[in-house]
């Protein structure tokens, strides 16, 4: 592994870890940063699958007490059974739409301009959601009904558009549907587990010919870096939301999206050429 490749792996692994669970779109940031670093092609596709697994492992590790509690209680405890049912219900819409439209969306929408527009629009929606009166009807994830889970699962499908943010859509959707900020955030984290693992397994099998043994050091380093930075991001977000709203992330999305659009409009960066590279 040469120094340039090492640099790209460290940057992309850190970007994935930091952005995967913040409501600012990890896919959008990966598209932008990968284009700037000229890291594309089949190797990059395989690399992205691996680093996403590193990020999701961080959430599994962080919430392992809750996971063990659910697994242990599944045979007899109604709370564990209801929580598992809600996760499956919320996961189902993404499975259907992902299988049907993932390739089409990747072909036509995975470009920096789509990301920029989605960042701005998502930021505006996030600001609106935070400023409206928030009536809490579900204070804890264990109190969710199946209808709450289904609505959040449908909203999660919006994240198939790069720049929207899976965590952003599920968290803000949860707030709009009456979940407390803590419940919406925790359910978003738990929903990420089957969603991201399912997507990674599906993509990994579909593009299995892209994985080469010679890339193992690159993949391993990216996996570890993504895990470390995702752990930092998850713990930081859980502490942050205890006393803050998501408005900070909304303004960041808007500013970042407008910056990308400005560089495109004034010709400072040829994003069309970058996306095609």
UniProtKB/Swiss-Prot annotation:
Looking up Pfam families in the UniProt record yields: BacA (PF02673)
Disulfide-bonded cysteine pairs: these are none
Q: What class of enzyme is it?
A: hydrolase
A GO CC term attached to the entry: plasma membrane
This protein's source sits in the domain of life called Bacteria
Which EC number applies? 3.6.1.27
Chief location of this protein? membrane
Cellular location(s): Cell inner membrane
User: Topology versus the membrane, per the UniProt entry?
Assistant: Multi-pass membrane protein
Under the heading InterPro entries, the entry gives: UppP (IPR003824)
- Keywords (A to Z) from UniProt: Antibiotic resistance, Cell inner membrane, Cell membrane, Cell shape, Cell wall biogenesis/degradation, Hydrolase, Membrane, Peptidoglycan synthesis, Transmembrane, Transmembrane helix
Catalytic reaction(s) noted: di-trans,octa-cis-undecaprenyl diphosphate + H2O = di-trans,octa-cis-undecaprenyl phosphate + phosphate + H(+)
Q: Which residues form a coiled coil?
A: none
**GO molecular function ontology, one term from the record:** undecaprenyl-diphosphatase activity
| Single GO biological process annotation from the record | regulation of cell shape
- Stretches that traverse the bilayer: 43-63, 87-107, 109-129, 183-203, 214-234, 254-274
User: What is the documented function of this protein?
Assistant: Catalyzes the dephosphorylation of undecaprenyl diphosphate (UPP). Confers resistance to bacitracin.
**Protein family per UniProt:** Belongs to the UppP family.
The miscellaneous annotation reads: Bacitracin is thought to be involved in the inhibition of peptidoglycan synthesis by sequestering undecaprenyl diphosphate, thereby reducing the pool of lipid carrier available.
- Protein's recorded name: Undecaprenyl-diphosphatase 2
Give the source species: Pseudomonas fluorescens (strain Pf0-1)
């Amino acid at each position: 592994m040469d120094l340039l490749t090492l640099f790209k792996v460290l940057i992309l692994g850190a970007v994935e870890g930091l952005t995967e669970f913040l409501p600012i779109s990890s896919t959008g940031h990966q598209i932008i940063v990968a284009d700037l670093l000229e890291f594309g092609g089949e190797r990059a596709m395989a690399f992205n699958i691996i680093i996403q697994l590193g990020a999701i492992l961080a959430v599994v590790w962080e919430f392992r007490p809750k996971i063990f509690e659910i697994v242990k209680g599944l045979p007899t405890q109604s709370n564990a059974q209801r929580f598992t049912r809600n996760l499956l219900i919320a996961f189902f819409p993404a499975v259907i739409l992902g299988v049907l439209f993932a390739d089409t969306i990747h072909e036509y929408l995975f470009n920096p301009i789509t990301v920029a527009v989605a960042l701005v629009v998502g930021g505006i929606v996030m600001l609106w959601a935070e400023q409206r009166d928030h009536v809490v009807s579900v204070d804890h994830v264990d109190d969710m009904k199946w209808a709450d889970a289904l609505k959040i699962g449908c909203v999660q499908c919006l994240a198939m558009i790069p720049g929207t943010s899976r965590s952003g859509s599920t968290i803000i959707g949860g707030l709009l549907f009456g979940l407390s900020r803590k419940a919406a955030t925790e359910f978003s984290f738990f929903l990420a587990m089957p969603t991201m693992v399912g997507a990674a397994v599906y993509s990994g099998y579909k593009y299995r010919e892209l994985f080469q043994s010679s890339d193992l050091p690159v993949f391993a380093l990216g996996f570890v870096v993504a895990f470390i930075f995702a752990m930092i991001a998850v713990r930081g977000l859980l502490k942050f939301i205890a006393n803050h709203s998501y408005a900070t992330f909304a303004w960041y999305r808007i500013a970042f999206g407008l910056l990308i659009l400005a560089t495109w409009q004034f010709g400072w960066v040829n994003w069309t050429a970058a996306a095609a590279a």
